[in-house]
Amino acid sequence: MLDPKFLRSDIETAAERLALRGYKLDVATINALEEQRKVLQTRTQELQAERNARSKAIGEAKRLGQDVAPLMAQVGSLGSELEQCKKQQDEILEQLRQIALLVPNLPADTVPVGKDESENVEVRRWGTPRQFDFEIKDHVAVGEDNGGLDFATATKISGSRFVVLKGQIARMHRALAQFMLDLHTQQHGYTECYVPYLVNADSLLGTGQLPKFAEDLFHTAINGEGDEEGKVRKFSLIPTAEVPLTNIARDEIYDEKALPVKMTAHSPCFRSEAGSYGRDTRGLIRMHQFDKVEMVQLVHPEKSWDALEEMVGHAEKVLQLLGLPYRVVSLCTGDMGFSAAKTYDLEVWLPAQNTYREISSCSNCTDFQARRMQARVRGADSKPQLLHTLNGSGLAVGRTLVAVLENYQQADGRIEVPEVLRPYMSGLTHIG
């Protein structure tokens, strides 16, 4: 959430910057509410001063033995009006808050300006795409030929956009996640976490999925027990482990010496893919359920931009060790996620599609999520201030499996196991 004081005091600047990402701020409504708030605030201050004066007069009248009933009646009337003014102020502040919850983060000055993904800017490339001397198969054909991808059975069990992984390909999927976790915890300084896959609305509000993106989530509810007996407990399945990991900081104040806090988790992710009808209907690219290794950092505000570059490097290292060609792209203003001030995407080379596809997004959310969560940091001689949050995929496990199946396919139909995965697969060198 943006700073409400900034929205009220410099709304034109906010509107201009938000317009760069295709968001039209309702300036007229905010200004009208702000004018009402100012009028009520002024009236509240006048009433408080008048009531204080009447209260002093009552004390003086009592001292002189005068009748205080008229003054008491006046104070009572002032009190009623004062309470009404405060109530109206609170209602207006809540209206402003609800508007603010729907406003995305401001793009950083270094973000390229553009309308959509076609205007994203390539930053660098790593690796050279392999030249095949046989007809390339896509990951679906490679996986099915090796008995490891079963979409038909998953459709019977659940419907479209699900898969059953089997045998050595299921094992490779597990190996990829273990490899990523080991890399991030042993070399990059992250603490591994196991997190809830069901979260409450406050958590989703904190990271920015709610209230705007409720249709992208899967929701469920159960009857409460214990102190909550008779109530309905509502949950949503996590769209990413970013949600529970980042919310660890909700309502917390960290000593600045404890930062950065770096956390990672392997979890399934659940997305309705609303608005994606007809896109990537074949294969593992766009699923309702997929696994991801997530990275989250909580950092001092002065260090978040360096932390973003570091996090991108951590995601890149996974691809480099797997020997998968990729490129790094800076998302333009019109393609960034709701909570991000700046985002880099890593796109891996998929030979069957003859293109690069997203496999990781790394974002600096500055104080946008922290303000919603009241996640703060305090120095030795300073008041608590909002910390900065960052998140990144390190990586999407299913899409990494796709990249391995396509880039490591062999002419005889087998799949070579990347060298860094072999210790996780009992030394296996090939599948098939």
From Swiss-Prot:
What keywords does the record list, in alphabetical order?
Aminoacyl-tRNA synthetase, ATP-binding, Cytoplasm, Ligase, Nucleotide-binding, Protein biosynthesis
Q: Which reaction does it catalyse?
A: tRNA(Ser) + L-serine + ATP = L-seryl-tRNA(Ser) + AMP + diphosphate + H(+); tRNA(Sec) + L-serine + ATP = L-seryl-tRNA(Sec) + AMP + diphosphate + H(+)
Per its UniProt record, what Gene3D superfamilies does this chain match?
Bira Bifunctional Protein, Domain 2, Serine-tRNA synthetase, tRNA binding domain
Q: Which domain of life is it from?
A: Bacteria
Top-level class of the enzyme under EC nomenclature: ligase
Any one GO MF term held by the record is: ATP binding
Q: GO CC terms for this protein?
A: cytoplasm
E.C. numbers: 6.1.1.11
Share what the entry says about its subunit structure, partners included.
Answer: Homodimer. The tRNA molecule binds across the dimer.
Give the protein's biological function.
Answer: Catalyzes the attachment of serine to tRNA(Ser). Is also able to aminoacylate tRNA(Sec) with serine, to form the misacylated tRNA L-seryl-tRNA(Sec), which will be further converted into selenocysteinyl-tRNA(Sec).
**PANTHER family assigned to the protein according to its UniProt record, in alphabetical order:** SERINE--TRNA LIGASE, SERYL-TRNA SYNTHETASE
What is the protein named? Answer: Serine--tRNA ligase
Traced from the root, the source organism's taxonomic lineage reads: Bacteria, Pseudomonadati, Pseudomonadota, Gammaproteobacteria, Aeromonadales
